[in-house]
């Protein structure tokens, strides 16, 4: 089953729906699971796999969705400063109401197009990298958002990482996977590949060559 937590940018707009499935609250958009309630009784699969290997001082979540990654980071490391970017105001509203994001005062939620936001932040950073961990979880209508693996976006993400920071990409295993990995490797050093259901989580560090 596909599990993709984040929305990316304008495109196909389906209303998010929250349901209880197998005793667990889930958010679906267009039939695809976008987020799950973090519960000690269940593994969180994809979102657990996206957590950085070491405790970050700060984190950026591109494609906040229902906030599973933010909740898991908080559970593991406490209230570290986080920024979550989510395109859809309806998803943000449900995440606050149904998934407890209002209980995370250390999480700053930005309702915006993640690509435009990253480009602006990278331009304004002027060499001052901001985040130890960045999670890229950007999907539209169940498909990887166009531009996620574009050279300009990848370079902007790298600019927002600290020199020893880590980025995690949530990819869908498909015939395009080898090409997608090559695109990432042009900008980052891939350190680990984690399989989670039909997803592949790519962990990488910025290249400095």
State what each model feature region is.
Residues 29-32, 136-139, 207:
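Generic beta-structure capping elements
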């Amino acid at each position: 089953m596909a599990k993709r937590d984040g929305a990316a940018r304008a495109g196909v707009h389906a209303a998010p729906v929250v349901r209880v499935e197998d005793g667990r609250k889930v958010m679906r958009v267009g039939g695809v699971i976008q987020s799950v309630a973090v519960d000690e009784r269940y593994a969180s699969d994809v979102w657990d796999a996206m957590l950085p290997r070491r405790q970050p001082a700060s984190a950026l979540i591109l494609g906040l969705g229902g906030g599973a990654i933010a909740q898991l980071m908080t559970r593991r490391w406490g209230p570290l400063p986080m920024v979550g970017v989510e395109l859809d105001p309806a998803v943000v509203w449900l995440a606050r109401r149904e998934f407890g994001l209002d209980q995370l005062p250390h999480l700053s939620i930005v309702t915006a197009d993640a690509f435009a936001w990253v480009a602006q932040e990278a331009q304004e950073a002027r060499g001052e990298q901001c985040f130890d961990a960045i999670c890229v979880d950007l999907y539209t209508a169940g498909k990887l958002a166009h531009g996620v693996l574009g050279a300009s976006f990848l370079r902007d993400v790298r600019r927002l990482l600290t020199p020893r920071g880590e980025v995690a990409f949530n990819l869908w295993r498909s015939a395009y996977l080898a090409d997608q990995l090559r695109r990432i490797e042009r900008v980052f050093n891939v350190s680990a590949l984690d399989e989670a259901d039909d997803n592949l989580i790519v962990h990488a560090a910025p290249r400095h060559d």
